[in-house]
Amino acid sequence: MLDTSIQELIDKWQKYLDLQRNYSNHTVISYNNDLKHFLEFMNYYNSELVTINHIKTADIRLIRSWLAKRNCDNFTTSSISRGLSAVKNFYRFLEKTTQLNSHIIFSIKSPKKTKLLPKALSEDDVVISLEHIEEYGNVKWVELRNKALLVLIYASGLRISEALSITKLHLQNLEFIRIIGKGSKERIIPWLPIAKNLITQYLEILPYKLGDNEPIFRGKQGKKLQPPVFNRELIKLKHFYGLPQHLTAHSFRHSFASHLLEHGADLRSIQELLGHKSLSTTQNYTKTSIKHLEAVYTTAYPIKK
C-alpha cells in the first residue's frame, strides 16, 4: 500500500526510464519490483505508511538494513546490486523532479559481484535436448513451437527475450536475422536453414492468425509466449533425461558460443554474433573452453593414467 503521491512519482519514473532513457521493458519491470521491495521494507521499518518525507530522509542505517534483509532472503549478489541501482536511479529522478539534493544513498557502494563463468552444455546434451523437446507439449503445434524455438536459440545464440521477439517480418530476409539486443544495439545473424524450416512448419499449423509485426511464438491461449513458460518445458525435459541442472534457455546461448569456440571460431566473430559490447565479456568463453580441455586432459590423457 503506497501513498498516492508516491505512486504518481513511481509512474512518472517508469515513463522516464521507458521513453527518455530507453530502458528495456524487462529492466523497467525489474527496477519497479526492486523499488517496491525497498518501499515495503521502509513501511515495515518505520511502522507507518511511507510518505515522500520518509523517502527524502531515509538514512544510511535503513538502506543498509534493507540490503542485509535481501541478503538474508537469499537474493543473489547480482540481484542485490541491481536493487540498489534501481533505488539510486529513483533517487536521481527525484533530484531532477523535486527538491531532493545529494542523498546519502549515493555514497553506498554495491556489493562486489562474484564473476560466474557461463555454463555451457556438452554437445551430447544439446543433441538430446533438441531431439526430445518435442515430447513436452501435448499439442502438435506446441511441440513444434518448442523445438523451433530451442533450435533457433542454439543455432543463432539469441537471448530468450530476443528469440521471443521474432516476427514474420524477420522471416522475409532469406539470409539474415536483424536483432535489436541489449541497449538497442542491432546485430545481424545468418539464418540457419534448419531453424527457418522448423519455424515455417510451426507457423503452418499455428491455430492463431498473426500480423507481420506480431511475435510468432505464442502461448496456448494465443498470447505472446513468456520466458518462464518455455523454461518450465525445459525443466520437464531436464528431469526426465537427467540433464544438467544449469540447463535453461540461456544455457543454449552459452553453448552456441562455447561450441563455436571449440570448433575454431574466432572471438571477434563470436562477439558480433552474441552482441557483446565488450570483447572481455566474450573472453569468458575462452576460460570455460580451457576448463573443458583440462577436464578432457585429466580423464583421457594416457600419461596421467
UniProtKB/Swiss-Prot annotation:
The active site is at 159, 182, 250, 253, 276, 285 (o-(3'-phospho-dna)-tyrosine intermediate). It comes from the Bacteria. One of its GO terms (cellular component) is cytoplasm. Its main location: cytoplasm. The keyword Cytoplasm applies. One of its GO terms (biological process) is DNA transposition. This is Tyrosine recombinase XerC. It comes from Rickettsia felis (strain ATCC VR-1525 / URRWXCal2) (Rickettsia azadi). The gene is xerC.
